[in-house]
């Protein structure tokens, strides 16, 4: 895994979460669009950099199938990291009392959002790789 990609995915994940939670507050009647995240989420989102080497193995799969694979992987990562953070007493999310939750750590109804997020990370990582390749060809990297 490339550290540059880890850092960029961590930042992109934070941004996606802030936008997502902002829309959530708006849907609950708060027009201020207040979004939030946690510092704990940075390394979790940073792990999306693992999509880069995985993509090379599955790039010929249909787009939606790749998205479902990413979403399943993300939800597994969410469950494992959430379980560890809960054990340490610092888990920033708790889905207990919401529909379709698993142990209050994962929400199955978020699967479509994770499909989109996984594919967004794939596109971001492809862009970064192509940009680096183009700069290298020009002798700028």
Question: Where are the regions a protein language model picked out?
Answer:
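Aromatic-rich, lipid-facing transmembrane alpha helices and their immediate juxtamembrane interface loops
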Residues: 1-141
């Amino acid at each position: 895994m490339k550290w540059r990609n880890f850092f960029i995915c961590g930042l992109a994940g934070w941004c996606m979460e802030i936008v997502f939670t902002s829309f959530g507050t708006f849907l609950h009647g708060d027009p201020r669009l207040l979004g939030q995240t946690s510092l704990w989420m940075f390394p979790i989102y940073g792990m999306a950099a693992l999509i880069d080497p995985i993509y090379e193995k599955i790039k010929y799969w249909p787009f939606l199938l790749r998205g479902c694979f990413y979403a399943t992987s993300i939800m597994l990562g969410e469950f494992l990291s959430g379980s560890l953070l809960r054990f340490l007493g610092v888990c920033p999310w708790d889905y207990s009392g919401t529909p379709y939750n698993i142990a209050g750590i994962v929400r199955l109804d978020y699967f479509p959002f994770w499909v989109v997020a996984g594919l967004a990370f794939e596109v971001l990582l492809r862009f970064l790789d192509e940009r680096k390749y183009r700069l290298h060809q020009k002798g700028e990297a």
